[in-house]
């Protein structure tokens, strides 16, 4: 017999740093998900990722209190800020630039994000990343 789906939720958790403290613990606890089981499973799955990288995670939970999780790659903005060596994007991206990245760095980011992007080839993925860079005020050379 199939498990009865109760719901799903999205969290952004730093890679390898899931712990029962807020905001993870209360979000899981109020839905009846075993917090320690989630933390151990999440940290094990993200052990090979860069520690502290924000990982969007979709958690689907069932009536028997079990769950499945889909861990996605960190957001494009995280990769772009890291490549441009900046803390945040421009306040007014149309008038000011926050930093610069090279086309090679954009391609590298697009390759890393390819499985999570809605793109058929690397060129389309690069266009998506370029759009993110433009909206953050990051210039591409």
UniProtKB/Swiss-Prot annotation:
Belongs to the universal ribosomal protein uL11 family. One of its GO terms (molecular function) is large ribosomal subunit rRNA binding. The keyword Ribonucleoprotein applies. This is Large ribosomal subunit protein uL11. Keywords: Methylation, Ribonucleoprotein, Ribosomal protein, RNA-binding, rRNA-binding. Forms part of the ribosomal stalk which helps the ribosome interact with GTP-bound translation factors. One or more lysine residues are methylated. The gene is rplK. GO terms for cellular component: cytosolic large ribosomal subunit. Transmembrane segments: none annotated. Pfam families: Ribosomal_L11 (PF00298), Ribosomal_L11_N (PF03946). GO terms for biological process: translation. InterPro entries: Ribosomal_uL11, Ribosomal_uL11_bac-typ, Ribosomal_uL11_C, Ribosomal_uL11_C_sf, Ribosomal_uL11_N, Ribosomal_uL11_N_sf. Part of the ribosomal stalk of the 50S ribosomal subunit. Interacts with L10 and the large rRNA to form the base of the stalk. L10 forms an elongated spine to which L12 dimers bind in a sequential fashion forming a multimeric L10(L12)X complex. CDD domains: Ribosomal_L11.
């Amino acid at each position: 017999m199939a498990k009865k789906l109760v719901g799903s939720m999205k969290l952004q958790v730093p890679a390898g740093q899931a712990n029962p403290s807020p905001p993870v613990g209360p979000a899981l606890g109020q839905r009846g998900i075993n917090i320690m089981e989630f933390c151990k499973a999440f940290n094990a799955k993200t052990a090979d990722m860069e520690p502290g990288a924000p990982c969007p995670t979709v958690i689907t939970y069932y009536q028997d209190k079990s769950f499945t999780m889909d861990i996605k790659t960190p957001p494009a903005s995280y990769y772009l800020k890291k490549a441009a060596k900046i803390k945040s994007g421009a306040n007014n991206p149309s008038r000011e630039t926050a930093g610069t990245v090279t086309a090679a760095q954009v391609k590298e980011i697009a390759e890393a994000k390819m499985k999570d992007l809605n793109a058929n080839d690397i060129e389309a993925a690069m266009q998506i990343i370029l759009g993110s860079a433009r909206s953050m005020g990051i210039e591409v050379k």
